[in-house]
């Protein structure tokens, strides 16, 4: 706690308020056509005297975009670095949409810290992620970040992962001495709105749940009991902005907004159009260089589906 002393007839103690801004992105799903205005929104809202923390809630990577497919998500990581993300968790698109070896090396060039508390392999916690993290602000506020992804038990297992019950893991994490010693507990949730509401109703220790997965939107946040909830839709249509004011380790003010990124579209911006076109063309160019098989002729739709199903059966 920072205090100021004023000498005179009586000493006055002024408690310094810790002002924090959290910007959050979720479920981009490689909609890179949204990136130019999303980047401008992040840059604009980063101009603040508050301490700034930027987080991504998962499902950033989606192989539906050819450049994400061709780079196994590494291009997404480069853009996240450019946005200045500090912490990120994973969604099912990273956990299931990528092969295990792809996910294991996805964050090699990341300039941010991945966090995931309910995923492990046969060796335990993934090397590329922390199970939780305590962030200490310049003013001394300790924020415990916990993170969980939706437990698709049957689909994680064939990929070499064990996904754990997020509520059980949350309860265990809340009992950790380092988490109990924190001033604030924030959950980075890729669980969906029902889980988020359950967390808020069950665990008063959690101060804030930043949500994703179900693509829900809380334009001005939500409060359940003493827990705040935030969520910013999908595809980069919104940028979440949370302004916290903390005094003596307690939240005394919380403003939650979902800012429409369409407000940051520049009319007839040729650079944006060129950027979007170039990313798609580069993805197609790289994919065209990857030879999978020599078929002799082009397969029709039914033949392609049959081939895919046969491959799935072989692997399972």
Label the predicted regions:
Residues 4-12:
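Short, positively charged and aromatic/hydrophobic N-terminal segments
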Residues 12-261, 305, 311:
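Acidic, metal/ion-coordinating pockets
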């Amino acid at each position: 706690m920072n205090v100021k002393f004023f000498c005179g007839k009586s000493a006055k103690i002024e408690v310094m308020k810790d002002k924090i801004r959290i910007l959050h992105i979720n479920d981009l799903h490689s909609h890179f056509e949204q990136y130019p205005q999303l980047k401008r929104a992040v840059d604009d809202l980063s101009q603040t005297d508050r301490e700034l923390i930027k987080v991504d809630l998962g499902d950033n990577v989606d192989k539906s975009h050819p450049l994400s497919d061709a780079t196994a998500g590494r291009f997404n990581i480069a853009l996240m670095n450019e946005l200045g993300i500090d912490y990120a968790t994973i969604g099912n698109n990273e956990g299931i949409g990528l092969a295990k070896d792809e996910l294991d090396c996805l964050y090699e060039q990341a300039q941010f810290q991945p966090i995931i508390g309910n995923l492990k392999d046969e060796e335990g916690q993934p090397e590329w992620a922390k199970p939780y993290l305590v962030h200490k602000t310049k003013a001394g506020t300790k924020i415990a970040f916990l993170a969980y992804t939706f437990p698709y038990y049957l689909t994680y297992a064939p990929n070499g992962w064990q996904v754990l019950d997020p509520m059980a893991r949350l309860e265990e994490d809340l009992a950790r001495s380092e988490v109990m010693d924190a001033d604030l507990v924030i959950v980075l949730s890729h669980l969906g709105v029902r889980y988020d509401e359950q967390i808020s109703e069950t665990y008063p220790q959690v101060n804030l749940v930043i949500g994703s997965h179900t693509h829900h939107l809380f334009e001005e946040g939500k409060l359940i009991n003493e827990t705040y909830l935030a969520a910013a839709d999908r595809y980069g249509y919104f940028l979440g902005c949370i302004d916290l004011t903390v005094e003596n380790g307690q939240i005394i003010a919380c403003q939650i907004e979902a800012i429409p990124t369409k407000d940051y579209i520049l009319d007839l911006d040729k650079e944006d159009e060129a950027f979007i076109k170039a990313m798609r063309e580069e993805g197609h160019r790289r994919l065209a260089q990857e030879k999978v098989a020599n078929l002799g002729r082009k397969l029709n739709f039914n033949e392609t589906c049959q081939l895919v199903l046969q491959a799935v059966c072989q692997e399972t």
